[in-house]
Regions:
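Juxtamembrane intracellular "pre-TM" segments in multi-pass secondary transporters
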Residues: 28-38, 222-253, 277
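Extracytoplasmic gate region of multi-pass secondary transporters
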Residues: 62-63, 247-301, 357, 361, ...
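Extracellular/periplasmic helix-loop-helix junction of adjacent transmembrane segments
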Residues: 65-94
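Helix-breaking motifs and short loop linkers at transmembrane-helix boundaries and internal kinks
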Residues: 74, 107, 128-134, 145, ...
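Conserved MFS/SLC helix-loop-helix module at the cytosolic interface between two early adjacent transmembrane helices
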Residues: 94-133
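Structural signature of the two symmetry-related core transmembrane helices
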Residues: 110-124, 318-334
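Cytoplasmic helix-loop-helix junction between adjacent transmembrane helices
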Residues: 138-178
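Helix-loop-helix hairpin linking two adjacent transmembrane segments in secondary transporters
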Residues: 173-217, 221
Length: 446
């Protein structure tokens, strides 16, 4: 077993989150509004969930309009893979770390409101695109805005909740993901079928601007009221080095990159796969994917949040074990579902796969915050998003698109089916990484 080594930089008294400081005995925080001790701060969490909802909505509507968009501009699978993958993920990831540094010191609620409004306006402007290069520019502009979303969101949620209910809090936050995908696939498919793909972007952008204004009005920033208090005997250090010095955290990130590859490859290419292999139209595709990723994704996220909080009492490594089991099962069902001849049986297996694909993010997001302290929560979240987006979104959709074009000569319209085999392969790799991470404990859990 690898032995964890303490971080290299000098250690200073750890500054607990507001919620954990109350548990540590700081009476001055007991009457503070907005701090949830053993319970969920529902109003802030509702607003946080809405931010994640429009974050996924503005990102996923691109895949539901893949076929009409490709037909209008004559795009290849490789070009669409670039637009969905590395063309978005590279800028998103590069901006993530300076944004996280700001979020670790500044007003996260204000940052979230500004970022949400920015990416939503850029989403609406995507509807004015005239070809590949204007689409790429619009996607890059959306990425600039979305870079200010997830890291401060994770940091703020962790500071609002103590460790006893943190997984449930992140489960509520992550409900925005499947709900956003439901709206993107069902709503986007319906609008595209009734009007055109441009209208989809206009509507999604308007929804996002409204959410940004709500966040500006009602989302609290814990640090506005009172800074977190030092607690004797605890240690921390800010920045990335203390996190990356721990082998468990590195294994966690490796698994996250592989799972992200599978997740975003599935989200991006599932509509095209259903259209080509089962001749489904955009409206029916949106309904199937909306119910799959939306309804069953919600069930999966809620269940895994409850299970993780209960298991963690006896097993501190429960987060990694639950995530490893979920993606391991998803890998098996994904491999089976790709080659079932019947549309009905393939869709049933697809639902089970989606539940596994939806289940890993809550335990992994929570596990990342176990390694972090309030001084580097947003930085830890930025590392997580680096793995998910550059390793996952950047590689997954692009790789599938390139492989599909390479396999056209041998498999014609079925080339995408074989290119999607990277989904079960990367899920199996993620499961192995997280099982390894489960044997390693954080040096100073938060």
């Amino acid at each position: 077993m690898e032995r964890e080594q303490p971080p290299g930089p000098a250690l200073v008294p750890r500054r607990l989150s507001d919620a954990d400081a109350v548990l540590a005995g700081d009476p001055s925080l007991r009457v503070r509004p907005g701090i949830a001790i053993g319970k969920i701060a529902f109003i802030p969490m509702t607003l946080a969930m809405l931010v994640l909802l429009v974050h996924l909505l503005d990102r996923q509507i691109f895949s539901i309009v893949a076929q009409p968009l490709k037909a209008e501009f004559g795009l290849s699978d490789s070009q669409f893979g670039v637009l969905s993958g590395i063309g978005f993920a590279l800028l998103y990831t590069l901006l993530g770390f300076p944004v996280a540094k700001w979020a670790d010191r500044g007003d996260r609620a204000l940052l979230l409101a500004g970022a949400t409004i920015t990416w939503s306006v850029m989403t609406a402007l995507t509807g004015l695109a005239t070809g590949f290069w204007t689409l790429l520019a619009a996607r890059a502009a959306v990425a600039v805005g979305e870079a200010g979303g997830i890291a401060p969101l994770h940091s703020l949620v962790a500071d609002l909740h103590d460790v006893s209910c943190r997984a449930r809090a992140f489960a509520i936050l992550q409900l925005g993901g499947p709900i956003g995908m439901f709206v993107a696939f069902c709503g986007g498919g319906l609008i595209a079928a009734s009007f055109d793909w441009r209208t989809v972007f206009f509507v999604a952008g308007g929804i996002g601007v409204a959410v940004g204004l709500l966040v500006l009005w009602g989302l609290p920033e814990p640090r506005r009221k009172l800074p977190p208090r030092p607690v004797a005997g605890a240690v921390t250090s800010s920045g990335l080095r203390p996190l990356l010095a721990q082998a468990g955290f590195r294994w966690l990130l490796a698994g996250t990159a592989l799972a992200g590859t599978a997740f975003y490859a599935s989200l991006t290419w599932a509509p095209s796969f259903l259209a080509r292999s089962f001749q489904m139209d955009v409206g029916n595709i949106g309904l199937v994917l909306g119910v799959g990723f939306g309804l069953f994704g919600v069930i999966s996220v809620i269940a895994v949040g409850i299970v993780c909080d209960r298991l963690r009492v006896a097993r501190p490594n429960a987060y990694c074990i639950v995530a490893a089991c979920a993606v391991g099962a998803a890998a098996a069902f994904a491999a089976l579902g790709l080659f079932l001849p019947s549309k009905t049986s393939s869709l049933v297996v697809f639902i089970v796969t989606v539940m596994g694909l939806s289940a890993w993010q809550v335990p992994m997001i929570t596990a990342v915050q176990e390694y972090a302290s309030p001084g580097n929560r947003a930085s830890a979240a930025a590392l997580f998003m680096l793995a998910v987006n550059l390793g996952g979104m950047g590689v997954g959709p692009t790789l599938v698109g390139v492989l599909s074009d390479m396999l056209v000569a041998g498999y014609a319209s079925e080339s995408l089916r074989y290119a999607l085999l990277i989904v079960p392969v990367t899920l199996a790799g993620a499961s192995a990484c997280w099982l390894r991470a489960s044997s390693l404990r954080p040096v100073s859990p938060s």
